[in-house]
Structure formats: C-alpha cells, structure tokens
Amino acid sequence: MEDIKIKEIFENIYEVDLGDGLKRIATKSIVKGKKVYDEKIIKIGDEEYRIWNPNKSKLAAAIIKGLKVMPIKRDSKILYLGASAGTTPSHVADIADKGIVYAIEYAPRIMRELLDACAERENIIPILGDANKPQEYANIVEKVDVIYEDVAQPNQAEILIKNAKWFLKKGGYGMIAIKARSIDVTKDPKEIFKEQKEILEAGGFKIVDEVDIEPFEKDHVMFVGIWEGK
C-alpha cells in the first residue's frame, strides 16, 4: 500500500496514483464493503475508495479529461436525469454524502438494477419517471443545486431546460452529457454541439465549462452551465 498516492481534486473526489502511470479517480465510499458494479476498491486506513471507471461513467470521463467546474459538493441536492443502473449515481451519492440525489429512470427493467444500487445508499431517492415530464415527479423533488442529465434523446438540451424551470435554484448548475448521434446521425458532431450550446444559452444557462470526453465516449461533450433562468 506504500506506493498508493491519493489526492483530493474536488470535494470527495480523489486522484489515485497506483504507481503504474495511469490516471485514475475515485470517490470515498459511503457504504463500506459493497460494490455497485465491478469497480476496484482501495482501502487506506479506515476508508474505502471506489475507483471510478471513465468507460462506464461520462462524468468520470469528463473529470479525467480536465473538467474545471465541478458543482456537485458534499451538501448538494442533485436531480439526476437518466440514472440507468446506478453506476454514476452511486459515485455522485458518495460525493454528496451530506446531500441528496433524486435519481430519475424511465425504464422499469433498469429501475430494478437502480434499486439494487441504491439499496444501502440512503441519500439516493430512486424515482420511476419520464425526464420529459417533470410535473410527474414535482411532488417528490424539491429545489436542487445541480441537475445532471445523461438522457439519449434528440431533445436533450430542452429536457434540461424544462427541469431547470421546475427544480433548479437560480445560480444553480446544470451538467449535461450531449450525445451527438442521438440528435442527428447525418450532421457533423461539432455543429450539433454548437447548436445544443446555443439552445442551452437561449434557455437560461450560462455555459462555464465544456469537455470533449473522447476516447471514453465517441461524439460526446459535457457542458456545465449556471442557471440564470428565463
């Protein structure tokens, strides 16, 4: 264990050096002794750190690719759109260990996997719902500090704006993984990213960071914006 070096780069997010030259990040697990997927766990003293795989998480990929603005903090309230099986939400819950994660997933079959991932993470509230219809979960979700979206729909940017109008505090942050191929397979991805950025800005976001997450995901960009409201 002597050759393991660990350094906090954002709140509750750590850069891990195992001495092999590879760039790795990890979150400090809030549920010790439990894996959510096949992540490697490193024990240092009384703490357990879960290696965060950038091939399975667009947020991890963005951090490794140089994300500068990371709005998710220890006490953040987060609305997570497109929670899937819970891989990234479980790490987000580790980061926001004093906060809460409202995890929205549309597919009932995947929801079962999400429930398993959330079982012992008391700060995740899994919700079966359609991110296109925020009014359907408005009785559960409170005002939040951050909305994170990973939804492969042609109207991805509009979904973020719609949910921001319902739930995002003014001055809060939106984070969105834009997948060019979900919007238009015939267009140049760079043109799509430019258009989506303009939609987000026209909808009320001031974009403060953007990261291309290749080689982990092809034709994906992570945008981070401050909600100024419309």
Curated annotation (Swiss-Prot):
Protein name: Fibrillarin-like rRNA/tRNA 2'-O-methyltransferase
Keyword Lyase: no
EC class: transferase
Record's subunit section: Interacts with nop5. Component of box C/D small ribonucleoprotein (sRNP) particles that contain rpl7ae, FlpA and nop5, plus a guide RNA.
EC id: 2.1.1.-
Protein's gene: flpA
InterPro entries assigned to the protein according to its UniProt record, in alphabetical order: Fibrillarin, Fibrillarin_CS, SAM-dependent_MTases_sf
Family classification: Belongs to the methyltransferase superfamily. Fibrillarin family.
CDD domains in alphabetical order: AdoMet_MTases
Residues holding S-adenosyl-L-methionine: T87, T88, E105, Y106, D130, A131, D150, V151, A152, Q153
Gene3D superfamilies: Phosphorylase Kinase, domain 1, Vaccinia Virus protein VP39
Database matches in SMART domains: Fibrillarin
One Pfam assignment: Fibrillarin
Gene Ontology BP, a term: box C/D sno(s)RNA 3'-end processing
Function: Involved in pre-rRNA and tRNA processing. Utilizes the methyl donor S-adenosyl-L-methionine to catalyze the site-specific 2'-hydroxyl methylation of ribose moieties in rRNA and tRNA. Site specificity is provided by a guide RNA that base pairs with the substrate. Methylation occurs at a characteristic distance from the sequence involved in base pairing with the guide RNA.
Keywords on record: Methyltransferase, RNA-binding, rRNA processing, Transferase, tRNA processing
Lineage: Archaea, Methanobacteriati, Methanobacteriota, Methanomada group, Methanococci
HAMAP family membership: RNA_methyltransf_FlpA
MF-aspect GO terms: histone H2AQ104 methyltransferase activity; RNA binding; rRNA methyltransferase activity
